[in-house]
Amino acid sequence: RIYGNRIVLFAPLYVGNECINDCVYCGFRISNKECQRATLSKDELIAETEALEDKGHKRLIMVYGEHPEYSPEFIAETVQTVYNVKHNKGEIRRVNINAAPMDIEGFRTVKSVGIGTYQIFQETYHEETYKKLHPRGPKSNFLWRLYGLDRAMQAGIDDLGIGALMGLYNWRFEVMGLLYHTIHLEERFGVGPHTISFPRIEPAIGTDFTENPPYKVSDED
């Protein structure tokens, strides 16, 4: 009724997996010695973008770990680099980003380069579980992450994506959390999220937690 009967695809482009958080379920966590760290150089970023354009992609989501190196200015610069790449008549017309929550000024910086959707997942809306699974790092602050989208709205970014990682807690509770998060944004800002995501935990290198998540979610669920 709103978007029509269509499916829109976007390709993921991981810019860097450096991270100072220690999320129990994540292969990128700082304590995971098996994770090989890398951040794309400008030339590498251009090459990746050209390869995606050659495959016909026009929409990307750029993904960043949470690390001082990935500042709002760095994110804005990498987004602009992608927009500038025109290869064999291809171009990226929309760059969405998945990055750590910022302050309002940080969000204004990334907005200035014309991002599409800003996406951030709460992971779990169950606060006690959240604290157990995020023992250290900036992401350990439940409320800072929860109200990240409020700050994005205040910065003028009204195209947002929310989500919960299924398997961390009871999926029915998480669905309720997603719905109430949507209601909160609609009531405060007059607009809800553009997208709602519900990925499931998948195995990650050096991460035993992912092999047997406490709240497995089936296809039927």
Q: Which positions does each model-derived feature cover?
A:
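Conserved C-terminal portion of the radical SAM core fold
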Residues: 117, 143-207, 219-221
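Active-site beta-loop-alpha junctions enriched in small/polar residues
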Residues: 14, 65-67, 98-102, 123-125, ...
